[in-house]
């Protein structure tokens, strides 16, 4: 059996499969189905400084080979996360990644500060949120704001910092390089692609927010391309996500240069998808004579 262990920013993962934020809650529901200690890690539901009720419904709809969502970061707030959810995660036997979000720089800084001294292993910085003070544009769509928010959070946090990049930019590698120079210990990509669906009978968008984030198998080729481009530019680890539904997708991400992967929307249609992907990676390595997963990272051979 090959060694599936990976190291990202000093954090050891028993295997390279992490559940993606927003698709796994805080793990309790899935723990009723299987042993979640088998997972490499859990990136928790996006957490903000204060409780958020989320957007009004409808806020999820299906698309061909995917879904659109505008849930709006519904969550109990960081203090409730530490008090009510973290104790369960501490017993889960896997890496705990806190995904944090906010609408202003000071929100991010205060949220991450409240996670210092806790059992959280790593911070994942969601910079796809709108920056209210700058007119509502996403923190992740401007190099200047990526640099500013990454630097501020890095200074405030005692934990390794992974910055989650939005694909809704002209050049994602520029944002990755800026995050790296501002102190990010790793980057994860991609977050959702902005999309829209209209009901032709009512002439209204299917989502109450009009637009939403698209995820699922349809976005995989875009995510893979961006991971490949980013991994060739930065020196820090890259975690690949976006449309991974089967082990072959995960292997492609690893070959493209990802040190680990995150599985998200696939868990909605098959709760056991992350475990099947772990097993599939292991079988692929064994069948091809690899002794460790690190041997295939970045080994794609472009034409």
Indicate residue ranges for each PLM-predicted region:
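Predominant activation on well-ordered alpha-helical scaffold segments within soluble catalytic domains
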Residues: 31, 79-82, 86, 109, ...
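Short, surface-exposed connector motifs at secondary-structure boundaries
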Residues: 11-14, 91-96, 156-161, 232-236, ...
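Glycine-rich, proline-tolerant flexible connector loops at the mouths of alpha/beta enzymes
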Residues: 46-73, 127-140, 192-202, 206-211, ...
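N-terminal capping/small domains of soluble enzymes
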Residues: 1-96, 102
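Short amphipathic alpha-helical segments
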Residues: 30-32, 55, 112, 200-201, ...
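Alpha/beta enzyme core
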Residues: 103-239, 245-256
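Hydrophobic faces of well-ordered beta-strands that scaffold small-molecule active sites
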Residues: 4, 17-20, 40-44, 96-100, ...
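Alpha/beta catalytic cores of nucleotide-metabolism and tRNA/nucleoside-modifying enzymes
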Residues: 214-235, 239, 245-303
């Amino acid at each position: 059996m090959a060694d599936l262990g990976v190291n990202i920013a000093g954090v050891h993962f028993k295997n390279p499969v992490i559940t993606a934020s927003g698709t796994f809650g805080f793990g309790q529901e899935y723990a009723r189905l299987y042993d979640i200690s088998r997972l490499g890690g859990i990136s928790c539901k996006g957490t903000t400084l204060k409780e958020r009720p989320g957007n009004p419904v409808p806020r999820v709809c299906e698309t061909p080979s995917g879904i659109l969502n505008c849930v709006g970061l519904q969550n109990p707030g960081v203090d409730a996360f530490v008090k009510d959810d973290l104790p369960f995660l501490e017993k889960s036997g896997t890496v705990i990644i806190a995904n944090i979000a906010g609408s202003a720089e000071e929100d991010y800084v205060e949220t991450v500060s409240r996670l210092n001294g806790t059992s959280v292993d790593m911070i994942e910085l969601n910079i796809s949120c709108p920056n209210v003070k700058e007119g509502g544009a996403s923190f992740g769509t401007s190099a200047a704001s990526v640099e500013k928010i990454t630097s501020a959070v890095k200074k405030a946090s005692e934990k390794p910092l992974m910055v989650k990049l939005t694909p809704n930019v002209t050049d994602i590698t520029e944002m990755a390089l800026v995050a790296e120079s501002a102190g990010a210990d790793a980057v994860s990509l991609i977050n959702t692609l902005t999309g829209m669906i209209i009901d032709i009978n009512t002439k209204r968008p299917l989502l109450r927010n009009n637009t939403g984030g698209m995820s699922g198998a349809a976005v995989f080729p875009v995510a893979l391309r961006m991971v490949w481009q980013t991994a060739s530019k930065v020196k820090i680890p890259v975690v690949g996500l976006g449309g991974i539904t089967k082990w072959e997708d995960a292997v492609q991400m690893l070959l493209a240069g990802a040190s680990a992967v995150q599985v998200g929307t696939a868990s909605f249609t098959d709760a056991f998808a992350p475990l099947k992907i772990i097993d599939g990676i292991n079988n692929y390595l064994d069948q091809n004579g690899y002794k460790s997963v690190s041997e295939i990272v970045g080994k794609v051979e472009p034409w």
